[in-house]
Structures are given as structure tokens and as C-alpha cells.
Amino acid sequence: MKKIILFSLLLFIITACTTTKFVYDYGDKFVSWQLDSYFELNDEQEDFVEERMKIHLEWHRAEELPRYKRFLTDIQSRGEDGLTMSELDDGFSRFEAKQRRTFERLIPDAAFFLTKLSAEQINNLERKMAEENEEMLEKVENRHELIQERREEFLEEMEDWFGEFDPVQLVQINKWQTEWYTESSEPIERRMEYRLKSQTQILALLRSFPDKLTFEKWLSEWTRSWGREINSARDARILRNKKRILQVDKFITPEQRLHAIREL
């Protein structure tokens, strides 16, 4: 649902994807297609989404892209001699600020879009949610395969960023895979429980057909709930991932660090 309500999927692609020209040229169509897959948009809704996304993309190209380029330049210069926790904190704070600016811009249009949904479109969303939930439950049931898939993806991502590893390094990577991707069912099932609860609340809100201001307030509160001071579980997860980044940073060779910097 996150990628539906704020059109945020597109903006996250922009911040992480190197093919930004493609995104800026076709992002409005992509978001329209994505939303249509959940709601089955009518012509008026489709036109609204594409027109507003063109405006948001132009804003992003003019305002946020230069900031992002400066951000990457800073990371490249700081990363040459390794990273520190304070540098990671600073980088994450800048990323959060970017998120807030993006959300503040998208929320009014997202709220307006939600006020134009019909009962049938909300039912379409519910069916799509049910399909995705079924797929997730299948993954939970095949937990061993899911864990193995994550481990394989982890190694592929490491090689994409840092290049090839020697046999000694591969032993350490295998150790991290075991430590970081356990077969514990609790995190997966807890996320599924939270997902189902959130979906029930969202569908109930949509079916109450509130006005635009109510949707804006709800979206603002929802995005603020991602903040570190509110969501302690998220804070713990972010800290854990930062520590893992520092572990990897100390583990790689200077040549592998340069490889990662070039990948930026």
C-alpha cells in the first residue's frame, strides 16, 4: 500500500536508479500503470495521475536531483578511506530529509486522488491485496527456500558492489549469511500480521469516504510514524543495518572500496 498512496515507488526508484533519464521520461506512465493495476483507473483519474506526476518529476529533476548528486559526491569522497558511524548518521539524516520533502509535495495530490475512488475501485484494491497476501503466505510456508533465496541475493549484491571476493572473504560472507538470514519465522509472521492489520484499517478508512483534509492528515501522520523517535522497531533495524555496513566496510580491500565508489 505504501507504493500506492504516495506514488512513492517512483520517487524511490529515482533516488536509487542510475537510469534517471528513463524514469523522468516515462515515470508518469509507470505510476499510472502501477495504480491502475490496483484500482482500474478511469480516464479522468489516469489523466490526473499522469499530469500531476509530470509536474512532480519536473520538480524532482530541478530541485532534488542536484541535491542527490551532491549527496553521492560526498559519499564518494568520504568513502575513500572508509566510513564511520557519524558519516552514516549524516547520510541517513539527509536521506530522511529528502523523504520528508517528497512526501510533503505528494500528499495533497495523493489525498485528492483517494477522494475520487469509487466503491468498486476499493473492492479492486482489496482483491489485489488478497492476491499479494496469498503470495506472501506461500513464501512464509516455504521459509527455507525464502531464506536460501535471500542468501543468494545477498552474495550477488555484494559482488555487484565490490567485485569478486577471494576464498577467505567468501568464508566470512557465508558466516554473515548464516547470522543475518536465520530461519526464524517470527519476523516474517510478525510483518504479515502487521500487514493484515494495516490493510484492514486502510480499507475501512477508504470505505468511510472522508474528505481531502482527512486524508491529508492521515497521510501526514502515517509518514511521520516512520520517524525514529516514534517507531523504535524501525530505529533498531536501521541501527543494525548501519553496524552491518561498517562491518562490511572494514572487511573489504581498498580496491573493492573503489569498486563500490565507482558503482555510485
Name each region found by the language model:
Residues L35, V49, L106-L117, L125, ...:
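Short, structured motif recognition centered on aromatic/hydrophobic residues
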Residues M1-I4:
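Positively charged n-region of N-terminal signal peptides that target proteins for export
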Residues E63-E104:
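Mid-chain, structured segments of secreted extracytoplasmic proteins
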